[in-house]
């Protein structure tokens, strides 16, 4: 009797229930714990993991984004790096407050009027964040993400003290200043917004054709405007210098309808000749163009809209009305007075708040500004030193930088954010900043001075700032937080060389831009070595997922049904890096089937012992050929991983495992592995065993970043250790050796395909013998003849040059022929 071969892996299917057991095991082993020791000799890679807003559960797109980040972290670990891949929440800002207001039915500005009320509102925010953050952590953990969970998020005293320290530094250097300027204002959120926080939506409205009167001769000048409610704030009319209709009007004066004030007329190239009548109303303020022209032309603004989005006393007959109602009312008055020529329905783009979608107004506010206009070129130069993956997204950053027209307003009339560490002396007006180091709450604590350092006024005259920072002022220093810039200079100097920023393309103009700006201002260095930009997660129809559309897909039922590895496989193959990716449940099923296939392969391989020593010591030429072909696949996967891509590696390793290893090599050496017929020597049999194990082990290691569960389960069963503590496989051959050997493997693959096709054409099962024909294959794979004959149950011989006369090709172009056997 021959040897008995029983699989060491008894279970016939991969059980996704094993994933939870592995999670507990990984936790017990501290498998993904970051090493923050500056003396660790390994080169450091820091992943500036996006701190998510815990303002709601992730949909499948968000979950896929974070699993891709984990895949890159796992790859770097395989390459021997000390990988710092933290996960902590972005627990600041307007989005959190909006969600809390909705959840608890409160209004922040009403609740926070007193110190006690503000404390209660902040407690609600913290309570809400704790719950949602816990759900997010459970989700990424269930997906097998090996992040190091840092419980100190952006609302922790540690993080906030760092944000405040950067403010103090920049204030003292003159890069932050306070000024009264026109700013974009959200009447609903009661706060200033930066340019990057503004979204636009299409809105249906009217364009109104309004009569002005030329003071010099009394004739009418018709002006088209979408903002007639701002007539009281009109300071000038402008026309294009090349517009012949208005030649000679520059320097003259028009009389504003209803309000009767004098308005000067100017030429300006910014006017669009083909819009309306070609005359543009410059008023305070309809849009950013108005703001720019008021400054350029030295016009005196008249404020018409208050912080509630209501017209003030300067608006005359429409005072006290909300903006939209005021627009309708002023149009009625103009029509009644014979001053409205006509109105036309239009659809135009309206700026809205990025969170609550309320239309924004431009009002005058005294705010704190960070200088950014002076740094536009420097930010571009810093970005030019970074490696963008993919390169096409670099232009989006540059285009945004070019579009910036004002310094960054960083102060917000909100509550759940990092407080601005500033006190104002009510006696002398001095602005006072404390020493950096600890976390300050100026609205709730005593000032850190006994008296005003400038005028000596007692402490009671030092008024603490009540505003907080724009949340991006916090988030933008995340690369400094994860590299320990403020606390461990030695670690920072080593870690800051290899910082990876993974993020979506939708926040290029915010998180990416602000981070580059802030790190440059604070350190003089580029913030990142690599910038990895992904597309947007879409539903199966290619639409963004929104509650309003009812198309948000919860990842948890998908994971429960198919497993974390299956979901991760979809996340890897959903789209090429940088492009939008649609959810496709069929690709999740493919991932589940792939995990099952790997398990079955491993179960087969586990039937045979793993011989000691190098697999090359025993390998036949056939074995070496497939090891060399695997080398090619793994080199290509390694290169793609190194480009921060997971799409190509996932497809390459899938092809290697399923189409090459399972479909061809395993089938080819199955007879040799069992050797029940005694056709092969013991050495040849053990060579097959060694190669089976080596190919499987290499596939497991290469696939482990993408499918960490099933690969680790198999590796622990067969090889006694975690796959996640292994190193990326070294090549087994020189490039020249590999090229020659891999070519032989490809030829063997083509022979298999041709013979199987031949059997099908003859109506035979693949396991049935070919006893009426002889198969002719090109020379060069003589060493594979016995394996091929055992697999196909066919007589096989090689030929050189032209195929023998009378033979027929098995598959066109295959170079594999067959000829009838001589009786």
From Swiss-Prot:
Question: Where does it primarily localize?
Answer: cytoplasm
What GO cellular component is one of the record's annotations? Answer: cytosol
Reaction equation(s) it catalyzes: tRNA(Val) + L-valine + ATP = L-valyl-tRNA(Val) + AMP + diphosphate
Q: Which UniProt keywords apply?
A: Aminoacyl-tRNA synthetase, ATP-binding, Cytoplasm, Ligase, Nucleotide-binding, Protein biosynthesis
Q: Where is the signal peptide?
A: none
Which top-rank group of organisms is this from?
Archaea
- Residues binding ATP are 547
List, alphabetically, the Pfam families matched: Anticodon_1, tRNA-synt_1
Under Enzyme Commission nomenclature, its number is: 6.1.1.9
> What InterPro entries does UniProt report for this protein, alphabetically?
aa-tRNA-synth_Ia, Anticodon_Ia_Val, M/V/L/I-tRNA-synth_anticd-bd, Rossmann-like_a/b/a_fold, tRNAsynth_Ia_anticodon-bd, Val/Leu/Ile-tRNA-synth_edit, Valyl-tRNA_ligase
Q: Which GO terms describe its biological process?
A: valyl-tRNA aminoacylation
Give the location in the cell: Cytoplasm
List the molecular function annotations (GO) for this entry: aminoacyl-tRNA deacylase activity; ATP binding; valine-tRNA ligase activity
Question: Would the keyword Aminoacyl-tRNA synthetase turn up in this protein's UniProt record?
Answer: yes
Cited function: Catalyzes the attachment of valine to tRNA(Val). As ValRS can inadvertently accommodate and process structurally similar amino acids such as threonine, to avoid such errors, it has a 'posttransfer' editing activity that hydrolyzes mischarged Thr-tRNA(Val) in a tRNA-dependent manner.
According to its UniProt record, which protein family does this protein belong to?
Belongs to the class-I aminoacyl-tRNA synthetase family. ValS type 2 subfamily.
- Quote the entry's note on domains: ValRS has two distinct active sites: one for aminoacylation and one for editing. The misactivated threonine is translocated from the active site to the editing site.
| Name of the featured protein | Valine--tRNA ligase
Q: Which organism is it from?
A: Aeropyrum pernix (strain ATCC 700893 / DSM 11879 / JCM 9820 / NBRC 100138 / K1)
What lineage does the source organism belong to?
Archaea, Thermoproteota, Thermoprotei, Desulfurococcales, Desulfurococcaceae
């Amino acid at each position: 009797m021959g040897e008995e071969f029983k699989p060491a892996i008894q279970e016939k299917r991969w059980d996704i229930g094993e994933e939870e057991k592995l999670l507990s095991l990984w936790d017990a082993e501290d498998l993904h714990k970051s090493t923050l020791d500056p003396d660790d000799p390994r080169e450091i890679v820091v992943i500036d993991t996006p701190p998510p807003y815990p303002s709601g559960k992730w949909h499948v797109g968000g979950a896929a984004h974070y699993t891709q980040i984990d895949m890159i972290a796992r790859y770097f670990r395989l390459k021997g790096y000390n990988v710092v891949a933290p996960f902590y929440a972005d627990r600041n800002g307007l989005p959190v407050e909006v969600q809390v207001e909705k959840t608890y039915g409160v209004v922040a500005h009403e609740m926070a009027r007193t110190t006690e009320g503000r404390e209660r509102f902040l407690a609600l925010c913290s309570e809400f964040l704790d719950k949602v953050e816990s759900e997010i952590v459970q989700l990424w953990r269930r997906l097998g993400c090996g992040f190091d969970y840092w419980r100190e998020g952006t609302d922790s005293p540690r993080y906030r003290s760092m944000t405040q320290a950067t403010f103090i530094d920049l204030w003292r250097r003159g890069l932050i200043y306070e000024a009264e300027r026109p700013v974009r204002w959200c009447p609903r959120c009661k706060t200033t917004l930066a340019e990057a926080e503004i979204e636009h939506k299409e809105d249906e409205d009217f364009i109104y054709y309004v009569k002005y009167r030329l003071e010099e001769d009394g004739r009418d000048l018709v002006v088209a405007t979408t903002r007639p409610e701002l007539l009281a704030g009109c300071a000038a009319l402008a026309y294009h210098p090349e517009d012949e209709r208005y030649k000679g009007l520059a320097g003259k004066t028009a009389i504003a309808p209803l309000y009767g004030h004098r308005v000067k007329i100017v030429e300006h190239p910014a006017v669009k000749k083909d819009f309306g009548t070609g005359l543009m109303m410059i008023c305070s303020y309809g849009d950013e163009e108005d703001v720019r022209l008021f400054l350029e032309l030295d016009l005196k603004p008249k404020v018409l809209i208050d912080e509630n989005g209501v017209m003030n006393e300067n608006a005359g007959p429409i005072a006290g009305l909300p903006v939209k109602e005021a627009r309708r009312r002023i149009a009625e008055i103009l029509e009644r007075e014979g001053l409205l020529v006509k109105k036309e329905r239009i659809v135009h783009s309206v700026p809205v708040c990025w969170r609550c979608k309320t239309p924004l107004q431009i009002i005058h506010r005294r705010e704190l500004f960070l200088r950014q206009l002076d740094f536009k070129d420097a930010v571009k130069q810093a970005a030019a030193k970074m490696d963008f993956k993919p390169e096409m997204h670099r232009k989006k950053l540059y285009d945004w930088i070019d579009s910036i027209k004002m310094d960054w307003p960083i102060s917000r009339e909100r509550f759940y954010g990092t407080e601005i560490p500033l006190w104002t002396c009510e006696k002398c007006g001095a602005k006072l900043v404390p020493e950096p180091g600890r976390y300050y709450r100026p609205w709730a604590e005593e000032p850190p001075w006994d008296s005003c350092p400038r005028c000596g006024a007692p402490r009671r005259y030092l008024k603490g700032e009540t505003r907080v920072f724009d949340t991006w002022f916090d988030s933008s220093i995340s690369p400094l937080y994860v590299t320990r810039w403020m606390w461990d200079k030695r670690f920072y100097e080593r870690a800051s060389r290899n910082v990876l920023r993974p993020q979506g393309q939708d926040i290029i103009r915010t998180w990416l831009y602000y981070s580059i700006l802030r790190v440059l201002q604070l350190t003089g260095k580029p913030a990142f070595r690599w910038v990895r930009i992904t597309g947007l997660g879409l539903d199966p129809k290619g639409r963004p997922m929104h509650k309003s559309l009812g198309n948000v897909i919860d990842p948890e039922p998908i994971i429960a049904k198919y497993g974390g590895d299956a979901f991760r496989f979809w996340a890897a193959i959903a789209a090429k890096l940088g492009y939008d990716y649609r959810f496709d449940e069929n690709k999740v099923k493919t991932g589940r089937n792939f995990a099952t296939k790997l398990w079955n392969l491993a179960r087969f391989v586990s039937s045979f012992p793993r011989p000691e020593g190098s697999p090359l010591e025993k390998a036949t030429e056939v074995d070496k050929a497939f090891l060399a072909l695997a080398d090619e696949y793994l080199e290509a996967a390694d290169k793609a991983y190194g480009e921060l891509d997971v799409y190509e590696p996932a497809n390459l390793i899938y092809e290697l495992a399923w189409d090459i290893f399972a479909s061809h090599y395993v089938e080819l050496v199955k007879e040799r592995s069992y050797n029940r017929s005694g056709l092969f020597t013991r050495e040849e049999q053990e060579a097959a065993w060694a190669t089976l194990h080596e190919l499987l082990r290499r596939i497991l290691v290469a696939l482990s970043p993408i499918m960490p569960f099933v690969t680790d389960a198999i590796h622990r069963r067969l090889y006694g250790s975690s796959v996640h503590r292994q190193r990326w496989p070294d090549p087994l051959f020189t490039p020249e050796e590999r090229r020659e050997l891999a070519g032989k493997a490809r030829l063997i693959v083509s022979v298999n395909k041709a013979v199987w096709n031949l059997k099908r054409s003859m109506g035979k099962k693949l396991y049935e013998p070919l006893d009426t024909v002889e198969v002719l294959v090109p020379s060069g794979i003589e060493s594979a003849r016995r394996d091929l004959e055992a697999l196909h149950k066919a007589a096989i011989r090689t030929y050189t040059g032209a195929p023998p006369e009378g033979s027929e090709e098995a598959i066109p172009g295959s170079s594999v022929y067959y000829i009838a056997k001589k009786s």
